[in-house]
Each structure stands twice: as C-alpha cells, then as structure tokens.
Design a protein with these regions (language model features):
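Signature of alpha-helical transmembrane segments and their immediate interfacial
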Residues: 1-46, 380, 393-443, 456-459, ...
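Extracytoplasmic
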Residues: 95, 143-255, 266, 492-495, ...
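Hydrophobic, glycine/alanine-rich multi-pass transmembrane helices and their short helix-loop junctions
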Residues: 247, 276, 335-377, 382-383, ...
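Hydrophobic transmembrane alpha-helices and their membrane-interface caps
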Residues: 257-305, 641-691, 732, 759-763, ...
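Helix-loop junctions and hydrophobic alpha-helical segments within the transmembrane domains
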Residues: 312-339, 698-722
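Juxtamembrane segments of multi-pass membrane proteins
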Residues: 409-410, 414-538
C-alpha cells in the first residue's frame, strides 16, 4: 500500500494544537536544562588502545607478546648539549641526566621495569680482559662526577654498544627510555595521558637551560600536545558561530529568525554533549570536531526551514499556519537527508578502530537528535512569530536572474556542456587520485604541524640517534624446538633476516639476538673478529646466548619467541608498506614448521595495522555509504532516475576529494578517511532538497523539467548556496588551527561542502535532462521555458 501524504498532512494538522505546542516547548526546555548539567561532567578521553585496530592480525601478535616484550606505548626523553662544543661527559650533564631519569621513573603510569638510561642498572657492559670477562653497570655505583669517573663512563659506554641507542652518535646527547602502562596502577583507571604529558613537560621545564636542550617524544606526549591544541578548537567554534550569525542576519534581515535558526542549530550540540557522559563516553581529541560538524549541519537545515516559513508568510499565511506548512513540506525530505547524514557517519564504524567507531556513534547520534530539534522544535518556535518578523526581503527575487540562467542546464543542449565538464573533471580527478597514499606522508606525527615542538623534538632525536620512537618489532616464534636459542638453523635464519632487513630502504638499524650473540662469541675469543659468527656447536652457541638477559627484550624466558627490532627512518605510509612487504617476502620463503616470522609489534607495527585497516575499509565504506543512500532515495522518490541524479554528483565529488588529498600531500588515514563519508552524508542534502522540489513541481503542478528546476532553485537553491558557503567558511577557518589534522579536515570539508553544492546545482539537472526529461516531455507533451513565479 502506497504512503498517503495527504492523510499524513491532515493528521499533523489535527495535532497542531496550542496545548501540544506548549507541551513540546516545556519538554525541550526541561530536557535541555538536564543535558546542560550533564555536559558539565564531560571529560577528555584518550587512550592508546582506542587508536589501534585491535582485531587486526598484527595487533593480535602485539597483544599476545605485549607483556613479554613490551608494547608500542613508549616515551623517549633526550637531553642534548647546546652549542657547537662539548659532550655529555661533564658533571653538570650527568647530574641532569641522573635526576631526569629519577623524575621519569616516578611519573605515575610509567612501567618502572622498562625505564632505561645510562643510570639504570639494566644498562651494563661486558669486556674481555686477560683473566676472562669483566663487566658491570655503565655508570658505576661509585660515580661522583670526577674527571676519572667521567672517563670510566666514557669507556664503558663504548664497551656497552649503546652509542646510537642511549648515547647520541656524536656523544652530545643521551636518552631516557620508558614504556607506559594502559592503566594507572594507583587508581586502576585508564591512564590520563594529558597528565603524563604535563609531567613530562615539567621535566623539560626543570632541565632545559642555556647549556642543555630537552626533547620529548612518544604517544603520551603526542596526545598531550594534541589535547592542548584541541582546546583551541573552542576558539574556532566561537569564530564560526560569529561568522554564521553575521551571515545569517545578512541573509535573513531578521533578528528573530536568525536567533531561532541558531538556537535550533546549537540545541543538538548541547544535547549530544549532555548525552555522552550518560552513555559512558568522553570526548576524544580526534573527535572533538564533531560538535562543530553537527552545528554546521544544523544551520543548513535551520536555514531551509526558516526559508520556507518566510515564503509561506509572503503568501499571506499567519505565523502558525506558515510554520505548519513549513513542517509539512520539509519534514519528510529533511528527515531523509538527516538519515543519510547519519548513515554517512555510521558507515565509518566499519573501520575497526575504537576512536573511529566513537566518532561514528557521536556524530550519528547528533544528527538523529537534529530530527527532533530542527524538524519539530524549530517549527514550534516559528509558530509563535508574527507573520512579519522584520523587514524580510524575498531573497529568491534577488537571485532570480541567476536561477533563470542556471535552469537552462535542465535542457539537453546546455546539459551536454555541464556533463562534458563533469566528465573532464572526472578524468582529471581519477588520474590524480591514483597518487593518493595510505598513512602518514610527512615526518613526525601528522596531527601536528611540521614546526610544532613535538615534531622538532622528533627530528632532533632521529638525527642524533640510530634509533627513535619508530620501531617495527617482528616476533620469531618457534614450534616444537627445545632451546631454540642454541639451535644453529633457527639462529642462522634469524641472522639472515637481520642482515636482509638492514639492507631494506627506510630501515635505520636492526637489533636481534644473533647479532648480539656474535659479539659475545668474539668476546669469548679475545675479541677476534674471526669469531664474530654463530657456532654450529650448541654448547658454544649457548655460551654466546646465556649472557643476554630477557630484560633486553630480544628473547623470552624459554627462548620459544625472539624479537627482532627494526628501527625505521620515519613512519611515512609508503616507508611502512615497503618494509612490511619485505618482511612478508622473507617470511614467505623462510617460514617452516619449526619457525615463523610474525608481524608485528612496536609503534610502526601498530601503524602498519592501522594503515591496512584503513586501506581495507575505504572501498567497503564507500560502497556501504552509497548503497544505503541509494536505498533511501529509492524508497523516498520511487525512481531510479532520481537515485542516479542524486548519487552520481556525490560520487564525482568523492573522486575529486581523493585527488585534492593527493595534490595537497594528505594521506588516507584514521583522521581523513571519515571526511569523505561526512562530506557525502552532508552533501546529499542539496540533491534531496532540490530533487524533491523538482518532483513536486513536475508531478503536482504539471510543469516542464526546466520550469520545475527553476522553481526548485527559487525555493531551495538560495538556501543551499548560503549554507554551503557558510559551512565552507566556517570549516575553512580550521586551516589556521594549531592541529594539522584539523587544518586538513577543514580544507577537505570546505571543499566537499561547496563542490557538492555545485554538483547538485549544475550536474543534477544535466543528468535529469536526459534521465527524467524525455519521460516528462512524453507525458506532458511540452517543454516550456521558465516564467517568473510571483
């Protein structure tokens, strides 16, 4: 049975009673007050596990061996001598290094067993002397900072093999390395990364001087810096609010209409922020932009509603009747558009990363709330306005010549031009989009600008040391082998892997058990380089392996698993993909029933898993998104022609967005993949609103396609252009954000908002000219030009 719109209209008219309007207003006021209070309980909620795809095969390996070999949540604090002269072997520097090591050790959330520096007892040296072996802590317990003590430490550092690891290659810096727990051991709650970052910053403030520089990198410090930058989002929200208010007033020329539109746009934001603590969610720095997106979408729909209300009052209706008619005209297409928005947010939940799923949940919830606030509350508030709230000039009349000209694209002769231009853009976009890369494309972390303190620290550490925070951990798992560390075949395979990876482009250094064992073997034989090899004799091999403690992270207690640490020059997506490909290539030819090379741990392993998850999700996400929108449009308009007219421009803009990302050097990653879904979800509004009016004028008024499109532009086009430009300007201000990922999202969203609007205005009617026009001409028997609808 077909849906009866006239019956729906009559039923709504019967319900539009004064008591119901007052009850609805009271309900919204009470709920808003309660949710405002709840929003005060909202907290920033960031976590390492939320940022990674825990279901990915690499992450299963990571989780399995996290307690044995440590995780990827590492912090590096580097102290470096300032100036052109000098090195670390001074009393002043050593005092600072020891004190800083103690401060890092006592930061809540630090896994104290993993703290490593020249002053920790897990950093030792072994040397060959006439009597055999000698060794001890690199910095002896008797160290007092005398010249003799400093010379002893200098020699011990060289003997320990820590140059490039804990001591800079030029001897002008030293590292403190530590790993963080996921939960605070004191409270048992999730670790507060911002608090850890603040304490690390306090370490910097304490030891930074005119003689010493302090550099800090690691996940916790990155989260802290991103959170600090995210607070600046509030300033951009305020700026966008001011810009929107000014543009709304210029557009509406009415203070009451401007105020009501802003209230309706802000209401779902307030409700969303209030519901998050109730549902057990916080707000992650990566999704702190969602409230602004909800506000932008709210403005778009509020402008459409107030626009139709104004048109109704100009036809002579009183405020209440105008509000009712506006509700009847926009509730169905507006709700369908909002559901499409929500689907755009929901499909990104296909990416199995908690922070992305939370973004999808919060954004779709905000859009769902908009059906209540924009489609129900706003008409109720409008019903209390008088028919002439201010000097409202018909905006459509001002743009009438423009709409007359653009309506020509609904005729085949002009539609061909629009479609040829669209095809040209499609070809250029498809060609350029092939250059889009997955993952990070710059040095440092992409969430912050290249000149940020964090990325400058990262560059300083990478330039000074042979290792950085970027490490790929490959786990070598043995099966049914007793004492794998003394099995020559096993150790030789790992040794060959170590050599193979050391020669892979993008690898900075490699550390594995066989390499260490060969050095020890040489030590047992008076340091002879001829003995720097793996012995085939298990007893001799055992002698070389025994001194290597499990605390090094190179082997577990029974030697059933060994870790190969591959330090990378950077963590660009292309670098990671190449290194992972080489690991898989070696594993495919060397895995046996006794030995298996398993990816991956370390922060680069986490990035590899994330990049692969994003790469795998892109096509599926877009198919699900366009499939869902297609189904909704088909159910709404009962026409495949309508579906194609609405969907094809969106697909074109999605391809152009990928091309823009490739051109600007923005990689496809967790923070940018949702932009395409969000842009499509928001962009479908324009097509639905315009096509709904085209359908209405053709079927109910019997008008030609061009005349119907002209009327649709007068009714909906002005509001569509205004909202696209307003949202584009609002998110465009993000380009000046301290957060690079926010700046990237701002540029991409501004592009999506504006170009989706242009696609709906120019490409949609051109498609309709060939898909809908012939059928309409056959049915109506006419092709009239536009006339002024006064």
């Amino acid at each position: 049975m077909a849906w009866d719109k006239s019956a729906f209209d009559r039923k709504v008219g019967e319900l539009a009673q004064p008591w119901l309007r007052r009850a609805l207003l009271a309900f919204f006021v009470v709920v808003t007050a309660a949710l405002v209070y709840s929003a005060t309980q909202l907290k920033v909620d960031a976590g390492f596990n939320k940022m990674v795809p825990l279901e990915h095969e690499y992450m299963r390996t990571f989780t399995e061996y996290q307690k044995t070999f440590g995780g990827a949540n590492r912090v590096l604090v580097a102290l470096r001598v300032k100036g052109a002269d000098g090195d670390i072997y001074t009393p002043e520097f050593m005092r600072a290094l020891k004190s800083a090591t103690d401060d890092v050790f006592f930061i809540p959330g630090v896994d104290r067993a993993t703290v490593t520096s020249l002053f920790t007892p897990n950093v030792r040296f072994i040397e060959v002397i006439e009597e055999g072996f000698a060794g001890g802590n690199v910095v002896p317990a008797s160290f007092r900072g005398t010249p003799a003590d400093l010379e002893i430490v200098r020699q011990n550092v060289l003997k320990s093999g820590n140059v490039g690891r804990l001591v800079a290659n030029d001897f002008r810096g030293a590292l403190i390395r530590a790993e963080l727990l996921e939960a605070d051991p004191a409270s048992g709650k999730r670790l507060n990364y911002r608090a850890v970052a603040n304490q690390l910053e306090a370490v910097r403030g304490k030891y930074q001087s005119d003689r010493i520089d302090v550099h800090i990198i690691g996940f916790a410090k990155a989260v802290g810096d991103i959170t600090d930058g995210a607070i600046g989002v509030l300033a951009f929200f305020a700026l966008a609010f001011v810009i929107t208010t000014i543009l709304l007033y210029v557009y509406k020329r009415s203070l009451p209409l401007t105020a009501l539109a802003l209230v309706a746009a802000l209401m779902p934001v307030v409700w969303l922020l209030g519901l998050l603590p109730i549902l057990g969610y916080g707000i992650d720095p990566m999704s702190i932009l969602v409230p602004f997106l909800i506000f932008s979408i709210g403005v778009s729909h509020a402008v459409q509603m107030t626009n139709v209300w104004t048109q109704e009052t100009q036809l002579g209706h009183d405020g209440q009747t105008a509000a009712l008619n506006a509700f009847l005209k926009l509730f169905i297409p507006g709700s369908v558009a909002l559901i499409c928005n929500a689907l755009g947010f929901l499909v990104i939940m296909h990416i199995k990363i908690d922070v992305v799923r939370e973004l999808g949940i919060t954004a779709s919830l905000g859009v769902a709330l908009m059906i209540l606030t924009n489609k129900i509350l706003l008409p109720v508030m409008l019903s209390y306005l008088p028919a002439t709230p201010g000097p409202v000039q018909p905006v459509a009349d001002r743009f009438d010549p423009v709409w007359r000209a653009i309506s020509a694209f609904a005729e085949p002769r002009f539609a061909v031009v629009a479609l040829l231009v669209a095809t040209l853009f499609l070809g250029i976009g498809s060609w350029k989009a092939r250059d889009l890369k997955t993952g990070d494309l710059g040095k440092g972390i992409p969430e912050l600008h290249d000149d940020s303190r964090y990325n400058r620290d990262n560059l300083a550490i990478v330039d000074s040391f042979s290792i950085g925070v970027d490490v790929l951990s490959v786990i070598v798992q043995t099966k049914d082998v007793q004492g794998a560390c003394t099995d020559f075949a096993i150790m030789d395979t790992i040794d060959r892997f170590e050599f193979y990876m050391r020669n892979v482009h993008g690898v900075q250094s490699v550390l594995a058990l066989p390499g260490v064992a060969k050095v020890i073997s040489s030590g047992w034989n008076e340091g002879s380089l001829k003995w720097r090899a793996l012995s085939r004799n298990p007893d001799v091999l055992a002698q070389s392996v025994t001194p290597v403690d499990t605390a090094t992270g190179l082997l577990n207690t029974d030697c059933s698993a060994m870790q190969v640490l591959v330090f990378t020059r950077d963590h660009q997506g292309t670098t990671i993909a190449h290194i992972v490909k080489e690991v898989k290539k070696f594993a495919s030819t060397n895995n046996t029933p006794q030995i298996e090379f398993k990816l991956a741990s370390g922060n680069v392993g986490v990035m590899a898993a994330t990049n692969e998850a994003v790469d795998a999700a892109e096509v599926t996400m877009l198919l699900a998104l366009f499939g869902a929108i297609t189904l909704l449009c088909l159910l709404t308009f009962r026409s495949w022609e309508a579906v194609l007219c609405i969907i094809l421009p969106l697909m074109l803009v999605s391809i152009l967005c990928n091309a823009l990302m490739a051109t600007l050097g923005i990689g496809l990653k967790v923070s940018t993949l949702p932009v395409i879904a969000l842009g499509v979800g928001v962009g479908v509004d324009y097509g639905i609103y315009l096509y709904e009016q085209i359908k209405h004028h053709m079927e109910d008024q019997g008008e030609s396609l061009r005349e119907a499109y002209y009327q649709a532009l007068r009714d909906r086009g002005t509001a569509a252009v205004f909202t696209a430009v307003t949202m584009g300007i609002g998110v465009g201000t993000w380009a000046f954000s301290a957060l690079k990922f926010q700046a990237d999202m701002g540029i991409l969203l501004a592009f999506m908002f504006v170009v989706n609007m242009l696609g709906a205005i120019f490409v949609l009617p051109a498609l309709a000219a060939f898909l809908v026009g012939p059928r309409a001409r056959a049915g109506a028997g006419r092709d009239a030009g536009p006339t002024h609808a006064g």
